[in-house]
Amino acid sequence: MAQMYFYYSAMNAGKSTTLLQSSFNYQERGMTPVIFTAALDDRYGVGKVSSRIGLQSDAHLFRPDTNLYQEIAALHEVEKRHCILIDECQFLSKEQVYQLTEVVDKLHIPVLCYGLRTDFLGELFEGSKYLLSWADKLVELKTICHCGRKANMVIRTDEHGVAIKEGDQVAIGGNDRYVSVCRQHYKEALGK
């Protein structure tokens, strides 16, 4: 029976690596997965999912106006799809998360979503909020803070490495702009 999974973590826990490994596992068994990623994240090229360890794959793009159910149903009609993999799923809208539940419930295709739980202010992203509510399985991927404890928060920094306390929720960046830390070091960095 198909289910929807939400694999979440702070940055640098290996979400994209895990997604690419899952895709490989399906392909190795002669199955056809489909990878989607957010159009606004083009750090590694448009329509690419890349991991820090060098793995990469082409991906379909989703934008705020993409109807994921219709797009996946059309792909599935042409060729059977065995799994849908969504990278950067925190950028999904509430409606798109609902569309993915329809993929699971009507098309009977498993959907595996990978993304951040919260932003640099500790607030849930819209996509993450509804994945936490509607996913069948929640899986936390772990990374570590510089102190050795589990990192579950993300700090956005300026060009001098100083924590930023306000700004737009979405600002694409990697290790140059974001640091994963434990809650204690998050609060210390923001002066809370």
From Swiss-Prot:
Q: Which residues bind Zn(2+)?
A: C145, C147, C182, H185
Q: What EC number(s) has UniProt assigned to this enzyme?
A: 2.7.1.21
Listed PROSITE patterns: TK_CELLULAR_TYPE
S-S bridge residues: none
Q: Which GO terms describe its biological process?
A: DNA biosynthetic process; thymidine metabolic process
Where in or outside the cell?
Cytoplasm
Q: Give the source's domain of life in one word.
A: Bacteria
Task: Give a GO cellular-component term.
Answer: cytosol
> Which InterPro entries does its entry note?
P-loop_NTPase, Thymidine_kinase, Thymidine_kinase_CS
Where are the catalytic residues? E88 (proton acceptor)
Keywords of this protein's UniProt record, alphabetized?
Answer: ATP-binding, Cytoplasm, DNA synthesis, Kinase, Metal-binding, Nucleotide-binding, Transferase, Zinc
The reaction(s) annotated as catalysed by this protein in its Swiss-Prot or TrEMBL entry are: thymidine + ATP = dTMP + ADP + H(+)
Thylakoid found in the keyword field: no
Q: Name one GO molecular function term.
A: zinc ion binding
Keyword Ribosomal protein appears in the UniProt entry: no
Q: Where does ATP bind?
A: S9, A10, M11, N12, A13, G14, K15, S16, D87, E88, C89, Q90
What assembly does the database describe for this protein?
Answer: Homotetramer.
**Family indicated by similarity:** Belongs to the thymidine kinase family.
Which NCBIfam families does the annotation name? PRK04296.1-5
This chain's protein is named: Thymidine kinase
